[in-house]
């Protein structure tokens, strides 16, 4: 992964990190953090494994503490970390929330329009991309619905990502990463998730950007 000289780093962009992961065949873990102790624990584990890490906050987390607070918390920890650390907005629920995290200094933004129809998802995603890219902040989007209950959203049974739609979505939005639904389930869910790896392979054939599960 990206080498940090001198053992001291600031927050890094997720784009270079995930492109390096894609090129070299490894995954980067992303963890929701909701207080100082969680931030410290995740970074300690990442350092023990000598692994880059993505720290992320969700819309419900930002309801009780502002994006500035969490940015300052993670940025302070990142300065002392000896591994690359990304600050990411997870499942951004609106353009306004995405911009709040962007202005706070987050180095990676997700806008989740997967609960909207295809064209609306494209529109809101492109609006966030157009706002973030001039400042070199990468954007993640989601297509299809991930099952289970994560944050304060219920994904239900989940709707699989269509490979052809994924290719069109990426081309029309210019998004940097795409979260896809292949049977994955996050948080609390019923039953045992069954991953459609063939579908993942088909998406990979037509989408060149890093994929998020």
Which sequence ranges carry the predicted segments?
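Short, Lys/Arg-enriched N-terminal segments with co-localized hydrophobic residues
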Residues: 1-9
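N-terminal amphipathic alpha-helix/helix-capping segment at the start of soluble metabolic enzymes
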Residues: 9-29
């Amino acid at each position: 992964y990206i080498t940090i000289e001198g053992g001291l780093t600031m927050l890094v962009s997720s784009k270079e990190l995930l492109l390096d992961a894609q090129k070299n065949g490894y995954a980067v873990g992303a963890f929701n953090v909701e207080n100082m102790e969680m931030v410290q624990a995740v970074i300690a584990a990442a350092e023990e494994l000598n692994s880059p890490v993505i720290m992320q906050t969700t819309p419900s987390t930002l309801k009780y503490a502002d994006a500035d607070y969490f940015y300052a918390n993670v940025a302070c920890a990142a300065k002392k970390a000896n591994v690359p650390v990304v600050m990411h907005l997870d499942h951004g629920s609106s353009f306004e929330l995405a911009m709040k995290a962007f202005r706070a200094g987050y180095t990676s933004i997700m806008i989740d329009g997967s609960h909207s129809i295809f064209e609306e998802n494209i529109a809101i995603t492109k609006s966030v991309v157009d706002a973030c890219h001039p400042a070199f902040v990468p954007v993640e989007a989601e297509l299809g619905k991930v099952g289970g209950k994560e944050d304060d959203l219920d994904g239900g049974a989940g709707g699989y990502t269509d490979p052809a739609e994924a290719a069109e979505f990426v081309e029309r939005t210019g998004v940097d990463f795409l979260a896809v639904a292949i049977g994955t389930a996050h948080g609390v869910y019923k039953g045992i998730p069954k991953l459609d790896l063939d579908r993942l392979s088909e998406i990979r054939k037509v989408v060149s950007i890093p994929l998020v599960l």
